[in-house]
Amino acid sequence: MLDPRARTLLKTLIERYIADGQPVGSRTLSRYSGLELSPATIRNVMSDLEELGLVSSPHTSAGRVPTPRGYRLFVDTMLTVETPIDAAAVARQVQSTLQAGEPQQKVVAAAASVLSNLSQFAGVVLTPRRSHVFKQIEFMRLSEKRILLIIVTPEGDVQNRMLATPRDYSPSQLTEASNYINAHFAGLSFDEVRRRLRDEIDQLRGDMTALMHAAVTASTEVPDTEDTVLISGERNLLEVADLSSDMARLRKLFDVFDQKTGLLQLLDVSSHAQGVQIFIGGESTLVPIEEMSVVTAPYEVNGKIVGTLGVIGPTRMAYNRVIPIVDITARLLSLTLSQQ
């Protein structure tokens, strides 16, 4: 537990390091902390903070820099998100980018782009998982014995399947089959539809039953779409010296983007929590680079969490600026998708 004096000095040190990117010495702390302390007293406090693992001393400087543990204490207990940016302006920019009525994938990709543009780092979005449940289906005759099955999920996602049938069906027969399925089975999983069709087979004409079974089989034969991670603005991170000045670190950074497995795991963890979360490199095992942090928030469709979005940037980022960008974008993406 830090005393108020140590907390003030640590907070000042981290704020100055975020602003300037240079190790912070006792003279700078004296100037910006608002505390009337001698340089010797400040150095003693810094030594205590170093022993606690909250700051460290680069070999080339007399000043100190925050450690991952110091950043964690800062964002958890000292950070005041006073939104130095214009929150209303951010909301307007996000809203102008996220257009209701656009295909879901396009809206989600736009969210990654707006996160990158506003933060000047990389924006990332875990796209919604495809639903095992359908809201509506439709059959469309393409040619003799070839039918297009159109599936609409509760999230508004549209999936298409091609059906090859042993016989031809008229448009009226296809309408009859889709109306029956929509009236009796909408909101159920296709496994449940298959089970119920088996129970109701005596009530249906044989040719309709065959078509419905073909539709259910086609819907479940295709493997579930893998969770997709969309990234925008990776090149922005080339301008961040903390991440790009070392070639090995830069290679590791782009391995993160190429592999996406670690990002997928991190975003999945975030989707099980409410509100904004901050993952700090060197402190979180989910972030493989000590100089990198990820700020995330889940987003919803009709009150149900379906994915996560966030900003990838340096550990030395202005958290009080990035957090509201992520929070506002998540809220407005949720609103846009729920209006689909």
Curated annotation (Swiss-Prot):
InterPro entries in the cross-refs: GAF-like_dom_sf, HrcA, HrcA_C, WH-like_DNA-bd_sf, WH_DNA-bd_sf, WHTH_HrcA_DNA-bd, WHTH_transcript_rep_HrcA_IDD
Gene Ontology BP annotations: negative regulation of DNA-templated transcription
Alphabetically ordered keywords of this record: Repressor, Stress response, Transcription, Transcription regulation
Recorded GO MF terms: DNA binding
Keyword Transcription regulation attached: yes
Pfam family, one: HrcA_DNA-bdg
Stated family: Belongs to the HrcA family.
UniProt function note: Negative regulator of class I heat shock genes (grpE-dnaK-dnaJ and groELS operons). Prevents heat-shock induction of these operons.
Alphabetical list of PANTHER family matching this protein: HEAT-INDUCIBLE TRANSCRIPTION REPRESSOR HRCA
Protein name per UniProt: Heat-inducible transcription repressor HrcA
Source organism of this protein record: Burkholderia multivorans (strain ATCC 17616 / 249)
Lineage of producing organism: Bacteria, Pseudomonadati, Pseudomonadota, Betaproteobacteria, Burkholderiales
